[in-house]
């Protein structure tokens, strides 16, 4: 039982860490490409900025889903019920 809970805690840490790392890399690439595009064509900067914010909002949903899965494993672990039952 303790082994299962410790593996679940490790899994939660990996899920949260990789979700955060992936989002950080995505935001870095998105911001870099936005600045590159705005430097090439300054008249397109407002339109690119709107699209960047839309994509940033969608990109921010990825770690939120990861946090929900991590909270599920933390507080309502489905594997503990199978082990006890």
UniProtKB/Swiss-Prot annotation:
F-type ATPases have 2 components, F(1) - the catalytic core - and F(0) - the membrane proton channel. F(1) has five subunits: alpha(3), beta(3), gamma(1), delta(1), epsilon(1). F(0) has three main subunits: a(1), b(2) and c(10-14). The alpha and beta chains form an alternating ring which encloses part of the gamma chain. F(1) is attached to F(0) by a central stalk formed by the gamma and epsilon chains, while a peripheral stalk is formed by the delta and b chains. InterPro entries: ATP_synth_csu_bac/chlpt, ATP_synth_F0_csu, ATP_synth_F0_csu_DDCD_BS, ATP_synth_F0_csu_sf, ATPase_proteolipid_c-like_dom, F/V-ATP_Csub_sf. This is ATP synthase subunit c. F(1)F(0) ATP synthase produces ATP from ADP in the presence of a proton or sodium gradient. F-type ATPases consist of two structural domains, F(1) containing the extramembraneous catalytic core and F(0) containing the membrane proton channel, linked together by a central stalk and a peripheral stalk. During catalysis, ATP synthesis in the catalytic domain of F(1) is coupled via a rotary mechanism of the central stalk subunits to proton translocation. Key component of the F(0) channel; it plays a direct role in translocation across the membrane. A homomeric c-ring of between 10-14 subunits forms the central stalk rotor element with the F(1) delta and epsilon subunits. GO terms for molecular function: lipid binding; proton-transporting ATP synthase activity, rotational mechanism. The chain crosses the membrane at residues 10-30, 53-73. It comes from the Bacteria. Its main location: membrane. Belongs to the ATPase C chain family. The record marks 60 as: Reversibly protonated during proton transport. The keyword Nuclease does not apply. Keywords: ATP synthesis, Cell inner membrane, Cell membrane, CF(0), Hydrogen ion transport, Ion transport, Lipid-binding, Membrane, Transmembrane, Transmembrane helix, Transport. It is found in: Cell inner membrane. It is a multi-pass membrane protein. PROSITE patterns: ATPASE_C. HAMAP family: ATP_synth_c_bact. CDD domains: ATP-synt_Fo_c_ATPE. GO terms for cellular component: plasma membrane; proton-transporting ATP synthase complex; proton-transporting two-sector ATPase complex, proton-transporting domain.
